[in-house]
């Protein structure tokens, strides 16, 4: 959640940045009106309280005590009424603020959508083939690695069954990713895939993205859309010791998304599924540590792709494509020869204190004061899309898939 004091004190500046992040101008106008109303009603409340304080002290020596008592009683009623007005405005303001995204960093390019993201660099060269490379779903079906028909039969569309070497390769990737991330100093944690509403709120999924979540009927439980949610919230409501930071974690999980708004996109294959697997990086840092840890996380995910021999590129997301909780995001896109283009395989984001304010994660700074931490997250990597990338990049003209050397010991 945004710092409401900063929003109120620097409204025009912050509102401009939020417009770049596609926040509706009517919402910003409503916020401005609420801030003005709240200021007015608080002044009135303070005047009533000042009256009460002043004349309560004079009651003992007043000549007409009964008259003053009546005035104080009447004023007390006004204080209660005015307090209710202030509380109602504060609640309305906070409710709207819950759906306002994070402010983009100054380094984030202003842009409307993904077409205005900025390429930072390319890593490795895409492979060349003396034949037309196939897409992963063709290879997967011919090798009996991917069973779409039975996935749909037992579930619905956008579900798939992995079989034989395809399932083994997926498992090998998970183990390799965890080991790689641990070698870079990230502690492995294993968390529940079902979390409560407060946890979903803490990282920004609720209330704005409720319609994209799978919820358990009659229970305050949701299936996670990313392990960023439970891992970040491991420290919700806590005050951490300064010397424990940064905390760097990696986690494997299944992820569940309704993919609302994705109709017609990636309808074939396993690029976009309702259930998929991911190995995540999550860090909790002091404010002054978050930029360097962001670079560590980005380097970790990029080096992981390089270790698998997968060509990829770094993209700085523009304001219009930036996620709800992120102040800055760099996407990694892997080369898929079957599609003849780069596709997203990782997003590394610095959320600054946005999630920490919602989840109430603080640390005791050097001055002994409680201060909000910064939170960061990133995929290292999306397992299904890495499987897709290996299938397409390591295929031969006979339709066989060769396994990267670093994965062979995991079979």
From Swiss-Prot:
It comes from the Bacteria. ATP binds at residues 257-259, 344-347. GO terms for cellular component: cytoplasm. It catalyses: tRNA(Ser) + L-serine + ATP = L-seryl-tRNA(Ser) + AMP + diphosphate + H(+); tRNA(Sec) + L-serine + ATP = L-seryl-tRNA(Sec) + AMP + diphosphate + H(+). GO terms for molecular function: ATP binding; serine-tRNA ligase activity. Its EC number is 6.1.1.11. It is found in: Cytoplasm. Keywords: Aminoacyl-tRNA synthetase, ATP-binding, Cytoplasm, Ligase, Nucleotide-binding, Protein biosynthesis. It holds the Pfam family tRNA-synt_2b. Pathway: Aminoacyl-tRNA biosynthesis; selenocysteinyl-tRNA(Sec) biosynthesis; L-seryl-tRNA(Sec) from L-serine and tRNA(Sec): step 1/1. InterPro entries: aa-tRNA-synt_IIb (IPR002314), aa-tRNA-synth_II (IPR006195), aa-tRNA-synth_II/BPL/LPL (IPR045864), Ser-tRNA-ligase_type_1 (IPR002317), Ser-tRNA-synth_1_N (IPR015866), SerRS_1_N_sf (IPR042103), SerRS_core (IPR033729), tRNA-bd_arm (IPR010978). The keyword Nucleotide-binding applies. It is an enzyme of class 6 (ligase). Catalyzes the attachment of serine to tRNA(Ser). Is also able to aminoacylate tRNA(Sec) with serine, to form the misacylated tRNA L-seryl-tRNA(Sec), which will be further converted into selenocysteinyl-tRNA(Sec). Consists of two distinct domains, a catalytic core and a N-terminal extension that is involved in tRNA binding. Belongs to the class-II aminoacyl-tRNA synthetase family. Type-1 seryl-tRNA synthetase subfamily. Homodimer. The tRNA molecule binds across the dimer. This is Serine--tRNA ligase.
